[in-house]
Amino acid sequence: MKKVSVLGSTGSIGKKTVDLLLKRKEEYQVEALSANSNFALLAQQANLLNAKYAAISDERFYKDLKEDLLGTNVKVEVGAPGLANVASLPVDLSVIAIVGIAGLEPVIKVIESGTKVIALANKESIVCGGKLLLKKAKERSVQIIPIDSEHNAIFQVLQNDDKCVEKIILTASGGPFLNYSLEQLRNITVNQALSHPTWKMGKKISVDSATMMNKALEIIEAHHLFKISPNRIEAVVHPESIVHGVVVYQDGFSFAVLAETDMEIPIAYALSWPERSTLNYKLDLTKQKKLTFQEPDHKCFSSLKLSMEVLNSSSPHTNSIVLNAANEIAVNEFLKSRIGFLEVVEVVKSTIENFDKYSDINSLSDIISVDFESRILANEIIKSKGICSVE
């Protein structure tokens, strides 16, 4: 049996992972689960999977979790130290589905634990950890398998042949506002931004998809994960979301990975790697009336060019951290209807342009410091703009 941990088990990816593990209880021993605040679901999952540990990050819900797990053998951990403890448990495979920069330190703890395979759904840890994180993983022979469908697709192709690659193509659905004008985007509401046409996702990533900042972060992630220069990474809008990624080789051949739009598929791949699992998803191309591709609208969705500017800047690592931090702040403010939809990317741009606390990034504390300063600056920029509420 594979020993596994799932950090962030109550989010959208975490729940999908738990569902898969429940179907295959004879294959996996769940050592630990973690959640930020959803103690009720965490307790339920821990019971169903016979987990040894359950960690709740928000200390306010420690007693609730303890009460829900009374009479079980599940050990409860709490707060940042508790999350660090369960992340440090050596397992065969750790699924990391924590949202945002909060996932970075747990990823590093998992790498240091002796765990050899990380199924990673937290792109922000790669965006902010960059070469520092990947160097640590390489030194300890840790295999990182991306769960994002696009990177998972590229990973699968490059596993077979990573020589003579011309470029990689990441596909983007275009989000719910494909072909909208700038004027139309100006009045987008929170509910509209959360209604994705093809994927079922959490709130933060749904907004990121709507602004196409998700693809911007994925470009930075791909640059690090696959050690490929920014000018050899391309994003193409593909509304049907059937083709997830393409590797173009120098001899003119291109290898694409096709699959239905359900995150269970890349999660199952990561759980089973290096083997392949059996799922009921069978793509029927005869039922696909069309597969369309188009250039992104850089005028309406400038986040893609922003990611390229960051990677080609004189301080790409620092600017990547700034971009991520400012985006997390801006998305949070948009979700509270405190800034408008178009202002999300404007806040990110302005934060990068005005950030001046540059230094070498040599440790986790350096990353945390830049992240902290970026958040302060992003909040100041939002305050200077005033409230722009969209009902």
Swiss-Prot record:
Keywords: Isoprene biosynthesis, Manganese, Metal-binding, NADP, Oxidoreductase. NADPH binds at residues 10-13, 38, 122, 124, 202. Pathway: Isoprenoid biosynthesis; isopentenyl diphosphate biosynthesis via DXP pathway; isopentenyl diphosphate from 1-deoxy-D-xylulose 5-phosphate: step 1/6. Its EC number is 1.1.1.267. GO terms for biological process: isopentenyl diphosphate biosynthetic process, methylerythritol 4-phosphate pathway involved in terpenoid biosynthetic process. Its cofactor is Mg(2+); Mn(2+). InterPro entries: DXP_reductoisomerase (IPR003821), DXP_reductoisomerase_C (IPR013644), DXP_reductoisomerase_N (IPR013512), DXPR_C (IPR026877), DXPR_C_sf (IPR036169), NAD(P)-bd_dom_sf (IPR036291). Mn(2+) binds at residues 148, 150, 218. It catalyses: 2-C-methyl-D-erythritol 4-phosphate + NADP(+) = 1-deoxy-D-xylulose 5-phosphate + NADPH + H(+). 1-deoxy-D-xylulose 5-phosphate binds at residues 123, 149-150, 173, 196, 209, 214-215, 218. GO terms for molecular function: 1-deoxy-D-xylulose-5-phosphate reductoisomerase activity; manganese ion binding; NADPH binding. PANTHER family: 1-DEOXY-D-XYLULOSE 5-PHOSPHATE REDUCTOISOMERASE (PTHR30525), 1-DEOXY-D-XYLULOSE 5-PHOSPHATE REDUCTOISOMERASE, CHLOROPLASTIC (PTHR30525:SF0). Catalyzes the NADPH-dependent rearrangement and reduction of 1-deoxy-D-xylulose-5-phosphate (DXP) to 2-C-methyl-D-erythritol 4-phosphate (MEP). Belongs to the DXR family. This is 1-deoxy-D-xylulose 5-phosphate reductoisomerase. It comes from Wolbachia pipientis subsp. Culex pipiens (strain wPip).
